Amino acid sequence: MSANTEAQGSGRGLEAMKWIVVAILLIVAIVGNYLYRDMMLPLRALAVVILIAAAGGVALLTTKGKATVAFAREARTEVRKVIWPTRQETLHTTLIVAAVTAVMSLILWGLDGILVRLVSFITGLRF
C-alpha cells in the first residue's frame, strides 16, 4: 500500500515540475521580450513563439494536457457525426430570422413612440 502511495506522490511531483517548467517558459518569454526590446521585432516574435510552443508542448505532456487532447479528439469525432443542414435549409432559416427581426424592430419602434408620447403628455415636456 505504501509503495502505491509513493508512486502517486512521485507522479504528482513530476506533474508539478512540468507545470513549473511551463510557467518558467512563459515568464522567460514575457521578460525576455521586455528585456530585449531593442532587438529586431521579428527575432523577438520568433523567440516568443518558440517559447510559447515549448510551453504548450510541455503542458500537453501533463495529465491535464493529455485529457485535453483526448477531449479535442472526441469533439472532432462528434462534429463529424453531426448532420449539417443543407444550403437551402440554411437560407430559409436565415430569411425567417431576418423577417422576425424586422417585425420585432418595427413593433419595438412603435411601442417606443407610443411611450415617448405618453410620457411627454404626462410630464408636459415636448420631445
UniProtKB/Swiss-Prot annotation:
Lipid bilayer topology: Multi-pass membrane protein
GO cellular component terms, semicolon-separated: plasma membrane
BP GO terms, sorted: intracellular protein transmembrane transport; protein secretion; protein targeting; protein transport by the Sec complex
Transmembrane segments: 16-36, 41-61, 96-116
Keyword Transmembrane helix recorded: yes
Cited Pfam families: SecE
GO molecular function: protein transmembrane transporter activity
Entries under InterPro entries matching the protein: SecE_bac, SecE_sf, Translocase_SecE/Sec61-g
Primary site of residence: membrane
Top-level taxon in the UniProt lineage: Bacteria
Keywords, ordered alphabetically: Cell inner membrane, Cell membrane, Membrane, Protein transport, Translocation, Transmembrane, Transmembrane helix, Transport
Keyword Protein transport annotated: yes
Localization terms from the record: Cell inner membrane
Similarity comment: family membership: Belongs to the SecE/SEC61-gamma family.
HAMAP family named in the record: SecE
Function according to Swiss-Prot or TrEMBL: Essential subunit of the Sec protein translocation channel SecYEG. Clamps together the 2 halves of SecY. May contact the channel plug during translocation.
Subunit structure: Component of the Sec protein translocase complex. Heterotrimer consisting of SecY, SecE and SecG subunits. The heterotrimers can form oligomers, although 1 heterotrimer is thought to be able to translocate proteins. Interacts with the ribosome. Interacts with SecDF, and other proteins may be involved. Interacts with SecA.
Protein name, as recorded: Protein translocase subunit SecE
Species name: Salmonella typhimurium (strain LT2 / SGSC1412 / ATCC 700720)
Gene: secE
